[in-house]
Amino acid sequence: SKCRIGKDGFYSVTCTEKENLCFTQF
């Protein structure tokens, strides 16, 4: 599943399907 852009404006790799949130990882 793809992830939306995080608050920092970067694509995140880890996502939570329950709340559909994304965390930015470098």
UniProtKB/Swiss-Prot annotation:
Main localisation, per the record? secreted
User: What's an example GO cellular component term for this entry?
Assistant: extracellular region
Q: Which GO terms describe its molecular function?
A: acetylcholine receptor inhibitor activity; ion channel regulator activity; toxin activity
Write out the annotated subcellular location: Secreted
Q: Provide the disulphide bond pattern.
A: 3-22
The organs and tissues expressing this protein are described as: Expressed by the venom gland.
Q: Which superkingdom?
A: Eukaryota
What are the record keywords, sorted?
Acetylcholine receptor inhibiting toxin, Disulfide bond, Ion channel impairing toxin, Neurotoxin, Postsynaptic neurotoxin, Secreted, Toxin
* Function according to Swiss-Prot or TrEMBL: Binds and may inhibit nicotinic acetylcholine receptors (nAChR).
Q: Which family does it belong to?
A: Belongs to the three-finger toxin family. Short-chain subfamily.
Identification of the protein by name? Nicotinic acetylcholine receptor-binding protein Mnn-1A
Organism name = Micrurus nigrocinctus
